[in-house]
Amino acid sequence: MKEKIKKLYSLQLREGGIADDVFHFLPEDEQDMLDEIKGRFFLRPEFRKRIKVVLTGGVFDILHIGHIHTLNEAKKHGDLLVVAVATDSHIEKKKRKTIHSQEYRAAMVEFLKPVDVALLGKAKPKDLLEFVGPDVIVYGYDQEPFIKPEGVEVIKLSKQVEGEKFKTSKIIEELGV
């Protein structure tokens, strides 16, 4: 049952609701877990409550062992790991540059073993939280918990890989990019 719920919630997150043409191909027992809202289908709350959704995020411009470690640790805190990948516009606002586009970075993260869903961040953190509805938010060792919603467990990882700090900016500097 839990695997079916995870599958349906993942579909819902990737597409902003499950489209009618996808809904009709789902087995009847899975269709019964969904409610129609404005022409799209969403997991009913009584089923959503049966899984623990973990949200984490980052830029993920040059993937390295520190990212993998953080994602593996985040996954341990729930059933479904959702990773918000920072948008290009968000990064530009912080006066930073990326090597890879937001779409490329999201696709790379989506293929990592611990990740169930990778999606682009939203302009406002509140909108992302409303969209994902996490039970847990995990921040990496080098991230400051900037949002702590009521009723959501917030975890800050302190563990680093082999005591070393892996930073994309240091890797870029070493590569001379």
Which functions belong to the PLM regions below?
Residues 1-177:
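Nucleotidyltransferase catalytic core that binds NTPs
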